[in-house]
């Protein structure tokens, strides 16, 4: 499968939008490869000696390193360029998504109200959104993950996938495989006889890491949970557009509400770095509660 598969729910840039996105990607690449790469030398030859001169010892914590680095104009310049690049990336993506917003909402309705739906969507109108998710525009995504503008709104999910594709392209992540496909390959190599019949993807976001498990384990009942309604609507429509049946639910990773010992495979893909320490611990306990005897928990992340 292509690393970023083309499907009807994926926004399509016009010529000028694509040119702006490619420029932004080049800028972010330059900052990463040529500006950020000098931070180690900046610390060793300027920031650390300045700290030693003032305190008579080397920095002993991340906080002390941060303090002395933040005082350096070169690091301030890098930080400004790094944030500007991220803001420019989202602005370039927004041009395409706001132009396509009505079309995406209409396609969401078309796919999810079809008599040929393979999966389902369960949203909770009384869901108590975690403040850590609702009060912050995570990764500077406009509106954050939890923005919701109505019953047919899929904008947060569209931002997540389209912006994420551009971001990971610049970092060389998953050039030939998606996170989900890497997870499938790991399972097949590590547990060649493992054939899960019920699978749960925690923090499934737009469903791009969930769908590969439907392809790999065609007889499995695949579920995905997340807290954000707009992202889940997008995930549902995306899966249906690709002809894949996934059951999406608006639920909390720390308290999923599923029955004990009800899944063979419980997993997540780059979700835990968005969780608090307490949520991560609760999620791990929930894993053990949900797993059938002989089941597998698999979590990949950057932290």
Q: What are the language-model segments listed below?
A:
Residues 5-20, 24, 28, 60-151:
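N-terminal auxiliary segments of SAM/dcSAM-dependent transferases
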